[in-house]
């Protein structure tokens, strides 16, 4: 059995595509391969189901995060997601999307937009915050601020002034859509009277101007655990957009970005840095003090270290997000020569060269001429 195609490839979008781009790409494929437009075409039906399976995962923030990390394996061990058996299953799952194109008539089932007075969950929100490499080691509590919407307290989300009524739109009959027939297909568009809401407000609520929603500025404290990396997403339940008409709020997803450090390069839990050492310490070995992200530590340089060798400082890297280990720091050693030799140093080196049978320049050569 051939492996499953990449979901982003199926929809024809980049991996970093936003939800609007993903939704538009899926709509385009749904129109192209819809069974009503391709009666009896099994290949079109399979492509239709394939696109629906991809959209089911990529349109859900949690499922998409799992897929981005583990691929199809995220859903092969009871994880759920990405599977439809027939067209009716797809229609029931994505009725609101298809309704925009087919006037609610999908597979012989009449569908309507949600009533604005029906309780609905608020949307999920995305927030990006930046932390330092030191924060990755220690963890940090940060205060974040963002703007969102919630139900208007005055009208409780109805959009109507107290004591006035919300009536069903006479133009669309409450569906939020007007339908026109074009040959075999019934094509729908947003109702121009109620703008897709299905209801008409005669006396709008003044605080929210009839929208039923008001802006809200929110501050929350967020605990960022040690070991996170750029791209890590933290879910804060119920801190997203407020629900509609008493519905539950959405969630807040905070994406982490780690600032680049001046001295250290990160590779998973390990850190890498450059270290210049005098040739004598490299030859004879030494215990030296080196910088770390949070301070300083002692590093044992082995005897006979070569230029370009990596010397490891154990346990001074970054913690694992799961908390079961800590990485190391690798110092790439560069040989450091003195600008000028003292006479006794030069004498000793010449004696070493003579003992090893090495040909060197005469006295007053390279080091002797440098000022």
Curated annotation (Swiss-Prot):
GO terms for molecular function: ATP binding; heat shock protein binding; unfolded protein binding; zinc ion binding. Residues 6-71 form the J domain. Zn(2+) 2 binds at residues 169, 172, 191, 194. SMART domains: DnaJ. GO terms for biological process: chaperone cofactor-dependent protein refolding; DNA replication; protein refolding; response to heat. CXXCXGXG motif repeats lie at residues 152-159, 169-176, 191-198, 205-212. Binds 2 Zn(2+) ions per monomer. A zinc finger (CR-type) spans 139-217. Disulfide bonds: none annotated. GO terms for cellular component: cytoplasm. The keyword Zinc applies. Keywords: Chaperone, Cytoplasm, DNA replication, Metal-binding, Repeat, Stress response, Zinc, Zinc-finger. Belongs to the DnaJ family. The J domain is necessary and sufficient to stimulate DnaK ATPase activity. Zinc center 1 plays an important role in the autonomous, DnaK-independent chaperone activity of DnaJ. Zinc center 2 is essential for interaction with DnaK and for DnaJ activity. Participates actively in the response to hyperosmotic and heat shock by preventing the aggregation of stress-denatured proteins and by disaggregating proteins, also in an autonomous, DnaK-independent fashion. Unfolded proteins bind initially to DnaJ; upon interaction with the DnaJ-bound protein, DnaK hydrolyzes its bound ATP, resulting in the formation of a stable complex. GrpE releases ADP from DnaK; ATP binding to DnaK triggers the release of the substrate protein, thus completing the reaction cycle. Homodimer. PANTHER family: CHAPERONE PROTEIN DNAJ (PTHR43096:SF48), DNAJ HOMOLOG 1, MITOCHONDRIAL-RELATED (PTHR43096). This is Chaperone protein DnaJ. It comes from Bdellovibrio bacteriovorus (strain ATCC 15356 / DSM 50701 / NCIMB 9529 / HD100).
